[in-house]
C-alpha cells in the first residue's frame, strides 16, 4: 500500500560493502497511484526482468539473483517466483522474471481464504481484500501457487505477527512439493520487527 524504495537501503548498503550488487525497486502502490495488486505484480516482474537484462552492465550473474521484500513487498517478491501471469505488455517475455532465491520479511503470503485457516479469517480476508485486485484474489495470493516449483526461500517472522499462520501454510505446501522453504522466527516480535534495533542486525 505505501511501500518505498528507501525501506531496505541500509540492508542494501550492508551487502554492497561485501561485494554484492543490491538494488532497491520502486513500484506503484495503491495509496499513491490508485492501482490494484495485479498492477503491482506487473511492476515487480518488470523490475526482475530489467535487472536480468542489464546483468552485464552491473556485473551480476543472471543465474544468481535473489528477490527480497518486507510485508507487501515480500508478497510481490514471492509473486515473481511463483506466478506466471500478470506481465506488463511492454515486457520481453523471453527474459525470466523468476528470481533464483527469495528472502522475505513478514510477507503477506496468504491473502485469500484457505480452508485450513480459522473461520474468522474468512470474513477478515474478504473485508480487507475486497476490490483490491482486478483478478480473483486467489490468483494474486502466493499460497495458491506454493506447491509449484520455486527457488529456495527463507522467511523471517515475529511470532506475534498474525501473518505468520499464512506463511506456515505456504511453507507446508512448498515443502510437500520438494522446495526448500525455511521460516526463522523471533519470539514475541510483531510486524516490521526487523526495521531497527537488535533485530535489524539479527536478520542481516
Language-model features: locations:
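Catalytic nucleophile-loop/oxyanion-hole region of alpha/beta-hydrolase
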Residues: 3-12, 23-62, 196-203
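A fold-wide structural signal in alpha/beta-hydrolase
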Residues: 14-28, 66, 182
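Conserved alpha/beta-hydrolase "acid-adjacent" motif
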Residues: 162-168
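Primarily recognizes the serine-hydrolase "nucleophile elbow" in alpha/beta-hydrolase
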Residues: 46-118, 137-138
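Short beta-strand/loop motif that positions the catalytic acidic residue
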Residues: 149, 154-157
Amino acid at each position: 500500500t505505501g511501500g518505498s524504495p528507501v525501506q531496505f537501503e541500509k540492508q542494501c548498503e550492508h551487502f554492497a560493502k561485501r561485494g554484492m550488487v543490491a538494488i532497491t525497486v520502486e513500484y506503484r502502490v495503491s495509496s499513491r497511484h490508485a492501482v490494484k495488486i495485479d498492477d503491482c505484480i506487473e511492476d515487480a516482474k518488470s523490475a526482475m526482468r530489467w535487472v536480468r537484462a542489464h546483468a552485464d552492465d552491473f556485473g551480476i550473474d543472471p543465474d544468481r539473483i535473489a528477490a527480497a521484500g518486507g510485508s507487501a513487498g515480500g508478497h510481490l517478491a514471492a509473486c515473481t517466483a511463483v506466478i506466471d501471469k500478470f506481465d506488463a505488455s511492454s515486457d520481453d517475455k523471453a527474459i525470466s522474471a523468476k528470481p533464483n532465491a527469495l528472502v522475505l520479511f513478514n510477507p503477506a503470503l496468504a491473502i485469500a481464504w484457505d480452508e485450513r485457516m480459522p473461520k474468522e479469517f474468512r470474513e477478515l480476508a474478504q473485508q480487507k481484500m475486497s476490490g483490491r485486485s482486478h483478478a480473483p484474489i486467489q490468483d494474486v495470493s502466493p499460497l495458491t501457487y506454493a506447491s509449484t516449483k520455486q527457488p529456495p526461500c527463507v522467511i523471517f517472522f515475529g511470532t506475534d505477527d498474525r501473518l505468520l499462520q499464512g506463511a506456515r501454510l505456504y511453507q507446508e505446501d512448498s515443502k510437500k512439493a520438494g522446495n526448500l522453504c525455511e521460516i526463522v522466527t523471533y519470539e514475541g516480535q510483531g510486524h516490521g520487527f526487523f526495521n531497527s534495533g537488535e533485530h535489524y542486525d539479527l536478520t542481516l
